C-alpha cells in the first residue's frame, strides 16, 4: 500500500507535464506531452500559432485538453494507482487567458467518462485561443494602462509591475475591442493556472493570489482589483461585468477548492476525496520547488537571466516585478527578467578563446581562468579606477537600452565616472567584467529587499541558489558570491526542468498536510532532502570584498544613468 500521492501539473508553452510525489517529496511518476511531437490536428510550431502582421502569438486551448488526456493516459500506462492521489495543484505559463463561453459550466458538469476531454469541451470556449507570453500586440493598451494611474511608477506601485504586452489586463482590453461580441458572450475568464484547476474541479476555479498579480489589474496593497484599471479594461461592458468574468480571489494559496470531478473518478479511478488546490503561475511555482526562505535569492542563468527572491519588503519599480507570494502571507515574490544572459557571456568566451588561439579542455576553461586571475573590477591597486561595463548583444529591458557595449572607469573616492580610454585589456578584462556587470545589476535592484542574516553582517541573502546552464560554472559562482553575498554560501540547485511541476506538487502536499498555521517553508523545509538537490559551489559573503562591490554598485548605477542620458532615454 503506497502512501498518499500528489500531482503537480506544469502547463508551459511547449509541453504539459504531470509530476507525482509522495508525502516525503520523492518523485514517483512523471508523464509528459510534448505539443509539437505528440499532438495531432494543430498546425502549431513550438506550441504556438502566430499572426505576425499583428504581433500575435497564441495557443489553441483544445490542444491543452488533448495534452491533459495524454498525460493522464501516460500515468495510467505507467501503472499508477489513481486512488492514492490525495491532492492536485498546477503551474501555468503566466499571463495567458482562457475565454469560457456561456455553456462552459454546464459542459464541465456533464462530462461523460467514456469520452476524452477534447471531444467534450471543444465547445466550452467563446474564443478558441489563449494569448501566449511572447505576444506583443498590445502596445496601445499598455500605453493606456501606464497612463491610467498617472504613470509607470504609479501602475507598478499598485499592481507590482508597469504595463507589459503579455500581461492579462492589456490583453483582455485588446480582446474586448477586437472581438466585442465574443467578449459579451464570454461568461468567465481564467488564467492558464486557474484553467487547469477548473478542468479538475468540474466548474470554473478562482484565480490564485500570486498569479493574479501578473495581470496589471490586481491592487496588491489593497488586496482587490483596482477599480480604475477595471474601468479602463472593461470598456462599454462595464466594471461589474468584468468582475463577474474574473471572479473572486481567495487569500489562502492552500485553500481546498473542492473535490475532483466525478469524471476523473469514473474514467481513471481517482478517489472521490481527491482535493483540488489553487494552481499558480510558473514563476511563483519555481520558488516553491525548494524551501526558499525570506531573503534567499534564486538566479536562473539561462539564455536570459531571471532573478527571483522571497521578501517581506514591497518596493515596486517599473524595471521589476512584485507578486504576492503563492503560499505565505506577508511575503512577496520579487522578480527581475533580463534579455541578455548566456549569449552575452558566450560572446566574451569565444573572443577569449580566439585571442589565445589554443583549444581549451572545455569551451569555458580559458574564460574561467581569466575571470579568476583578474582582480575585482580589474583593480590591480587601490588607486586604480574600477572597470565597469554594459554588454548587450540584444536590446535590454533592464535598463531599457539598445544593443551595444559601453565601458567606463569609475573612481569610488570622488565618485567620478569617465568613458574608458584604452585602459581595458580586451577581451581578457571583459571576462570578469561581464559577470560583474550582470551580478551588480542584480545587487543594485534587490537592495533594500534583504535583511542582515546575523550580528554585524550587512543585509544580503542568506543563500544564493544558481540554476540553469550558467550554474555549472565555478568562476561565475565565485563572482556571484563576492557580489551578491550569501551568508551561508552559493549553491547549485539541480532540479532540471522540473522546477514548476515540483513546486506545484509541493504546494499540494503542503495544502493537504499542513498543521494549523504551518507555513509552506516550515513543512517543506522539514521534508526536503537538500543533499539530493543542492551542492555548495562557492563562498558567499566575504568581508571587505562585499563592501567594495557595494561601492561598485553605486558606480554601476551612475554608469547606467549616464548611458541612458547619452541615448536620450533619461
From Swiss-Prot:
CDD domains, sorted: ASKHA_NBD_FGGY_SpXK-like (cd07776)
One annotated Gene Ontology cellular component of this protein: cytosol
EC numbers for this chain: 2.7.1.17
One GO biological process term: D-xylose metabolic process
Compartment annotation: Cytoplasm
Keyword annotations of the record: ATP-binding, Carbohydrate metabolism, Cytoplasm, Kinase, Nucleotide-binding, Transferase, Xylose metabolism
Domain of life (superkingdom): Eukaryota
Swiss-Prot/TrEMBL catalytic activity: D-xylulose + ATP = D-xylulose 5-phosphate + ADP + H(+)
Induction text: By D-xylose, L-arabinose or L-arabitol.
Gene3D superfamilies: 3.30.420.40
Binding positions for substrate per the UniProt entry: 95, 166, 282-283
InterPro entries named among the record's database cross-references: ATPase_NBD, D-XK_euk, FGGY_C, FGGY_N
Single GO molecular function: ATP binding
SS bond partners: none
Binding site for ATP: 364, 469-470, 473
Entry function: Highly specific D-xylulose kinase which participates in the catabolism of xylose. Xylose is a major component of hemicelluloses such as xylan. Most fungi utilize D-xylose via three enzymatic reactions, xylose reductase (XR), xylitol dehydrogenase (XDH), and xylulokinase, to form xylulose 5-phosphate, which enters pentose phosphate pathway.
PANTHER family named in the record: SUGAR KINASE, XYLULOSE KINASE
Record family assignment: Belongs to the FGGY kinase family.
Protein name, per record: Probable D-xylulose kinase A
Originating species: Aspergillus niger (strain ATCC MYA-4892 / CBS 513.88 / FGSC A1513)
Amino acid at each position: 500500500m503506497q502512501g498518499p500521492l500528489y500531482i503537480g501539473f506544469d502547463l508551459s508553452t511547449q509541453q504539459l507535464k504531470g509530476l507525482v510525489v509522495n508525502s516525503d517529496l520523492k518523485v514517483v511518476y512523471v508523464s509528459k506531452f510534448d505539443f509539437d511531437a505528440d499532438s495531432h490536428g494543430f498546425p502549431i510550431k513550438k506550441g504556438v500559432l502566430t499572426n505576425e502582421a499583428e504581433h500575435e502569438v497564441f495557443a489553441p486551448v483544445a490542444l491543452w485538453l488533448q495534452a491533459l488526456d495524454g498525460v493522464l493516459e501516460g500515468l495510467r500506462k505507467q501503472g499508477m494507482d489513481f486512488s492514492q492521489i490525495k491532492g492536485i495543484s498546477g503551474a501555468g505559463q503566466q499571463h495567458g487567458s482562457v475565454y469560457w463561453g456561456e455553456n462552459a459550466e454546464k459542459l464541465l458538469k456533464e462530462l461523460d467518462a467514456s469520452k476524452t476531454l477534447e471531444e467534450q469541451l471543444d465547445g466550452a470556449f467563446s474564443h478558441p485561443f489563449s494569448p501566449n507570453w511572447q505576444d506583443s500586440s498590445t502596445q496601445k493598451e499598455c500605453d493606456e494602462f501606464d497612463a491610467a494611474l498617472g504613470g509607470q511608477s504609479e501602475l507598478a506601485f499598485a499592481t507590482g509591475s508597469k504595463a507589459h504586452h503579455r500581461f492579462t489586463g492589456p490583453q483582455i482590453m485588446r480582446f474586448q475591442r477586437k472581438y466585442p461580441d465574443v467578449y459579451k458572450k464570454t461568461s468567465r475568464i481564467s488564467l492558464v493556472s486557474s484553467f487547469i484547476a477548473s478542468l479538475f474541479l468540474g466548474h470554473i476555479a478562482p484565480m490564485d493570489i500570486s498569479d493574479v498579480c501578473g495581470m496589471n489589474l490586481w491592487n496588491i496593497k489593497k488586496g482587490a482589483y483596482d477599480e480604475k484599471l477595471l474601468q479602463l479594461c472593461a470598456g462599454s461592458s462595464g466594471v461589474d461585468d468584468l468582475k463577474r468574468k474574473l471572479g473572486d480571489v481567495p487569500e489562502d494559496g492552500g485553500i481546498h477548492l473542492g473535490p475532483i470531478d466525478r469524471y476523473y473518478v469514473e474514467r481513471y479511478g481517482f478517489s472521490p476525496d481527491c482535493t483540488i488546490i489553487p494552481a499558480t503561475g510558473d514563476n511563483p511555482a519555481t520558488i516553491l520547488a525548494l524551501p526558499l526562505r525570506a531573503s534567499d535569492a534564486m538566479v536562473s542563468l539561462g539564455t536570459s537571466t531571471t532573478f527571483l527572491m522571497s521578501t517581506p519588503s514591497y518596493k515596486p519599480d517599473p524595471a521589476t516585478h512584485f507578486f504576492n507570494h503563492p503560499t505565505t502571507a506577508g511575503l512577496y515574490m520579487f522578480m527581475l527578467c533580463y534579455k541578455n544572459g548566456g549569449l552575452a557571456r558566450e560572446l566574451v568566451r569565444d573572443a577569449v578563446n580566439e585571442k589565445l588561439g589554443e583549444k581549451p579542455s572545455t569551451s569555458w576553461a580559458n574564460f574561467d581562468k581569466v575571470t579568476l586571475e583578474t582582480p575585482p573590477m580589474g583593480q590591480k591597486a587601490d588607486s586604480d579606477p574600477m572597470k565597469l561595463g554594459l554588454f548587450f548583444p540584444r536590446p535590454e529591458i533592464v535598463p531599457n537600452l539598445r544593443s551595444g557595449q559601453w565601458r567606463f572607469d569609475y573612481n569610488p573616492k570622488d565618485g567620478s565616472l569617465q568613458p574608458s580610454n584604452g585602459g581595458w585589456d580586451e577581451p581578457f578584462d571583459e571576462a570578469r567584467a561581464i559577470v560583474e556587470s550582470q551580478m551588480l545589476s542584480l545587487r543594485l535592484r534587490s537592495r533594500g529587499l534583504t535583511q542582515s542574516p546575523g550580528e554585524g553582517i550587512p543585509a544580503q541573502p542568506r543563500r544564493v541558489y544558481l540554476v540553469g546552464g550558467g550554474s555549472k560554472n565555478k568562476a561565475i559562482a565565485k563572482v556571484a558570491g563576492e557580489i551578491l553575498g550569501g551568508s551561508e554560501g552559493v549553491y547549485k540547485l539541480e532540479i532540471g526542468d522540473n522546477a514548476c511541476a515540483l513546486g506545484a506538487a509541493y504546494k499540494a502536499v503542503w495544502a493537504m498536510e499542513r498543521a494549523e498555521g504551518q507555513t509552506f517553508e516550515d513543512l517543506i523545509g522539514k521534508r526536503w532532502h537538500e543533499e539530493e538537490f543542492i551542492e555548495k559551489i562557492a563562498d558567499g559573503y566575504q568581508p571587505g570584498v562585499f563592501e567594495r562591490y557595494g561601492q561598485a554598485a553605486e558606480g554601476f548605477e551612475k554608469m547606467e544613468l549616464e548611458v541612458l542620458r547619452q541615448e536620450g532615454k533619461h
